[in-house]
Amino acid sequence: MKQSDVNLLCREAAACLQRMNWALPPEPQWAATDFGLGDYSSAGLVEVLLANEPEYCEKIMYARPDMVTPTHTHGKKKEDIVCRSGAVRMTLWNENPLTHPASGPVRVQINGQERTIASGEAFVLTPGERITLVPGIWHEFAPSAPDTLIGEVSTWCDEATDNFFADPRVDIFHAIEPDEAPEFGGFATDAQP
């Protein structure tokens, strides 16, 4: 991924945040990724880290419609994914869908209510709706409408050791080709709680 692509996606995210009247704190930490897959138009995400404390984490995220965050799970992190604007298409599995066929129900909380979702079946969160994901629930998401902002409120986020992707090619710490200067401040990758 080129730095010019990172800058472009972050500029798009900043414009969307402004249109949606989402104010950021001074000097926020930005990250844009194609997950190391080389095609950010199909798999990509912009994250703005708002807080990452030992007890909690908050992010606001942006992606273009149908720009997927690939199937993954966490070993420790519990998180709420919140549709802040637009629409978020979610798909859930109890196990890695690349190694185990999608079968059986997935038990989750949506808007604080216990729900059963069919494994591998997509559903949509609309503005204000949230889903609570506990460690071990495999999930994939993508905006299904323009101007979608996705919130995340979670326990501490350990990007380096607590993201497990179904596709072994995914690399969230992939190299950025420096074809122009960075326009947005990035995440600190060595932060510890």
Positions of PLM-derived features:
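Short, solvent-exposed loop/turn positions at domain surfaces
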Residues: 57, 77, 111, 119-120, ...
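Conserved metal-binding segment of the jelly-roll/cupin
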Residues: 64, 120-145
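Glycine- and acidic-residue-biased ligand/ion/polar-headgroup-sensing regions
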Residues: 65, 76-98, 104, 111
